[in-house]
Amino acid sequence: MEREYEKNFYVEKASDIAARAQYDDNGFAKVELLPGVYHGGIQSFKCFLKAGHKVSPELFADKSVVIFFGKGEGELTDCDGVHKITEVAFYVPFMDKEKYEIHAIEDMEFVYNVIEMNQWDRAAFDRWHIRLPYFRLHSECVQYIQDCKGPNTEARMILCPKWHGRIILGTTRAVGEGTVEKGHPKVHQLNYCLGDSDFHMSVGYKAENNMETVQHHAGDWSFIPAGADHDLVSDPGKEVYYIWFEHYTDEQAMAKM
């Protein structure tokens, strides 16, 4: 397959992200992640909200948003009431139809993803999508089994295929193992590291013997272009814990699925 990107993977470390954070008078900072790298229609931002402060994120009529709450306790208030954020959590607002507000009880960190919707995305969304707004704590999400993952690896599905356009969302968590995956030729993958993460991410093309490895820790962000093989595995006693966020590359084909 023709490769769109020069590198096997792109990484931004948590410390570098935090160093770029500039707080406003409301205790809020937003930093774009890997700016200019992924040109497939998703912009991701690491957000920091200090304890005791609130933020009402921007609403979009023609774009969708997915939020990963990775650190710190808080509350999210929307048309369904008050959602307690007591662990890793996920939120998909109903575009510009319903407002919402995030209140930090502790210092919070979360990733705010803005997804463009072209004509194919919009047609698929209008035909069928999950009821929005959608809030889930990580522990409420269904577990799944996959043959590329270790026997003691916990995997959870957050957004199944076609639930919300071309995006697919889940988590992987383990100690001393992880996932060893063949490249997905039609799926780009973004990763957000959580918990006590300390693991190896190796990406490339095994048939070409060009795998490259980077050490990942909590708060790190990475992008794996479609097609690359990828292993995310921790050493004994170390944790691998990350959110994977996939974007299907062929919107016309997916619209027909």
Predicted feature locations:
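A short, N-terminal "cap"/entry segment at the start of jelly-roll beta-barrel domains
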Residues: 1-41, 118-180
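Short, conserved beta-strand element in jelly-roll/cupin
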Residues: 59-76, 183-205
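Short, charged beta-turn/beta-strand-edge "cap" motif at the junction between a beta-strand
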Residues: 97-101, 228-231
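Generic N-terminal amphipathic/basic segments
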Residues: 1-43, 47-88, 97-99
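C-terminal functional regions that serve as terminal interaction/effector modules
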Residues: 188-192, 212, 217-257
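Double-stranded beta-helix
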Residues: 5, 105-147, 235-257
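Short acidic-glycine-tyrosine-enriched beta hairpin
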Residues: 78-97, 207-226
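Short histidine-centered beta-strand/loop micro-motifs
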Residues: 54-61, 178-185, 213-214, 233-234
